[in-house]
Amino acid sequence: MVFRWLCVLLIIRMVLTYRVRARNTSADSENKIHDDATAASFGFRGGLVPGVTVYAYMTVPIVERFGLDWLERGSMQVKFHQPFYDGEEVLVRAEVDMSADPIKVAITAEGKDGIACATALATVNDRSEWLGEPRLQDYPEAPLPLIEARPVPSRELLLPGAVLGTLTEPLSLPDTAMLARLDERLPIYSDAPAIAHPFTLLSLANQILVRNYKLGPWIHTASDLINWSGVRDGERISVRGRIADCFERKGHEFVVLDLLLVANDGRVIQRVRHIAIYRPRTS
């Protein structure tokens, strides 16, 4: 009887793990927080591994276990507490509660000495209410500014409700170069019909910020997202959004974006609440 009870407990609660060597996938990007010298001037040990890269690592156990049930019908709230640096080992732990409705997964990305550098709570097969069901009419399209005409962000400019210029990107899958940079080996992203990687989608949240404003070094700190459908080779994604909030905390200037990713057929792909420090305090 005790053995049977233990077996049931193991079925409804499981721990999935994944190890990977962190890579600074944006060392040459416009955002110089990923550059060793610039990051050091802000008090870091080197260029920061991008938050979207850490997020990609954190999705591996949940996608390996649940596949499309998460990629097309799941959510995640992820926060980045401390940076990873290039070459460090990342241990991802995903504690799955199969008894919850919807299924819940508590995820940590641990670095040196077991420190949780990032944490997340995910749900599977979830049409969660915490972000609300998106309506296309709430996310109007708008033109992007010219690269050379992008304004420098400020609290006076980043007013809640301000509409962002729409970013449109075609998809060509599988993106083998990106998968190699992430050391990603799950066949769902490489075998036909390949689906877009979570890294690809959340990277668009960064890109719409960069294409709307002329930024100095900046830091992605958190994202709350819910997946509504997958997107595949040949589709075109438009990223629409607005400013949700702008505030100062401990000398850092933050911006919060409310974004909707839409396929060319009008299908909602993902809604994202994306949070970044657009102007870090100087050390």
Regions inferred by a protein language model and the residue ranges of each:
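Hot-dog-fold acyl-thioester-processing enzymes
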Residues: 3, 8-73, 129-222, 283
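HotDog/MaoC-like acyl-thioester-processing domains
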Residues: 3-20, 82-155, 227-283
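Hydrophobic beta-strand-centered segment that forms part of the acyl-chain substrate-binding groove
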Residues: 53-96, 100, 119, 198-243, ...
